[in-house]
């Protein structure tokens, strides 16, 4: 079996493909490497100018090694093997968008540190209960959330109750503007307020 691509190798490939210097690039695309990247390592700390780091479609099991990336705004980790939201302290103040759909996340513990998060794409993970969604309530700026494809969502969908699901999410996260790609409408907001006792 082929050895995993290292971050260092992936950066070199990116530089060759795009004719750029990775340490100066605002968007660094290391997605879909063949063979896949398995580990985020300290080489990432050299990407000082990076605002958007794309690591989707690899075999990464753990979020790590983001210290030094003080300009990071968008972290794309969709289609990996990640089980936990962790090791984001270094980017907690700057990160605005976390794209982490198609992973194996069952808990949102740790997400509350991302105080400036506006966008969270985490469809097709393993979220099963409302207690996890409640952890998002600490994120005042969160306005765009993708949850479809999680067991929690699927339970409602199977019972033709997606409108109830939407109201339940908005009840818990009143600042949301968009849920699963659809704007939160006035009607949903009113019903959520009533359900909240407002």
From Swiss-Prot:
Keyword vocabulary terms for this entry: Cell projection, Cilium, Cytoplasm, Cytoskeleton, Dynein, Flagellum, Leucine-rich repeat, Microtubule, Motor protein, Repeat
Keyword Ribonucleoprotein assigned: no
Matching Gene3D superfamilies: Ribonuclease Inhibitor
Organism: Chlamydomonas reinhardtii
Reported function: Part of the multisubunit axonemal ATPase complexes that generate the force for flagellar motility and govern beat frequency. Component of the outer arm dynein (ODA). May be involved in a mechanosensory feedback mechanism controlling ODA activity based on external conformational cues by tethering the outer arm dynein heavy chain (ODA2) to the A-tubule of the outer doublet microtubules within the axoneme.
SUPFAM superfamilies assigned: L domain-like
Similarity comment text for this entry: Belongs to the dynein light chain LC1-type family.
Full protein name: Dynein axonemal light chain 1
Phylogenetic classification of the source organism: Eukaryota, Viridiplantae, Chlorophyta, core chlorophytes, Chlorophyceae
UniProt LRR repeat ranges: 49-70, 71-92, 94-115, 116-137
Assembly behavior: Interacts with OCAD2, a outer arm dynein heavy chain. Interacts with tubulin (previously called p45) located within the A-tubule of the outer doublets in a ATP-independent manner.
A GO CC term assigned to this protein in UniProt: microtubule
Keyword Repeat: yes
Location of the protein in the cell: Cytoplasm, Cytoskeleton, Flagellum axoneme
Additional note from the record: Outer (ODAs) and inner (IDAs) dynein arms contain the molecular motors that generate the force to move cilia by ATP-dependent reactions. There are two mechanosensory systems that monitor and respond to the mechanical state (curvature) of the axoneme. One system involves the central pair microtubule complex and radial spokes and the second system involves the outer dynein arms.
Site entry (Controls the orientation of the C-terminal helical region), positions: 182, 185
Residues spanning the membrane: none
Effect on the protein of changing residue 196 to D: Reduces swimming velocity
Domain of life: Eukaryota
Effect of residue 196 to A: Reduces swimming velocity
Effect of residue 189 to A: Reduces swimming velocity
Residue span(s) of domain LRRCT: 157-195
Main localisation: cytoplasm
């Amino acid at each position: 079996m082929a050895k995993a691509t290292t971050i260092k190798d992936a950066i070199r490939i990116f530089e060759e493909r795009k004719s750029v210097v990775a340490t100066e690039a605002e968007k660094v695309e290391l997605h879909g490497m063949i063979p896949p990247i398995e580990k985020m390592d300290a080489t990432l700390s050299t990407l000082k100018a990076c605002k958007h780091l794309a690591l989707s479609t690899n075999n990464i099991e753990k979020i790590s090694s983001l210290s030094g990336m003080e300009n990071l705004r968008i972290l794309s980790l969709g289609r990996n093997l990640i089980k936990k939201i962790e090791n984001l302290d270094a980017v907690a103040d700057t990160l605005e968008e976390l794209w982490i759909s198609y992973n194996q996340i069952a808990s949102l513990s740790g997400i509350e540190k991302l105080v400036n998060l506006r966008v969270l794409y985490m469809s097709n993970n393993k979220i099963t209960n409302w207690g996890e969604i409640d952890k998002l309530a600490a994120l005042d700026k969160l306005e765009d959330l993708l949850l479809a494809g999680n067991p929690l969502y699927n339970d409602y969908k199977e019972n033709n109750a997606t409108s109830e699901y939407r109201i339940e999410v908005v009840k818990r996260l009143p600042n949301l503007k968009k849920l699963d790609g659809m704007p939160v409408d006035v009607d949903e907001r009113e019903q959520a307020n009533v359900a909240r006792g407002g």
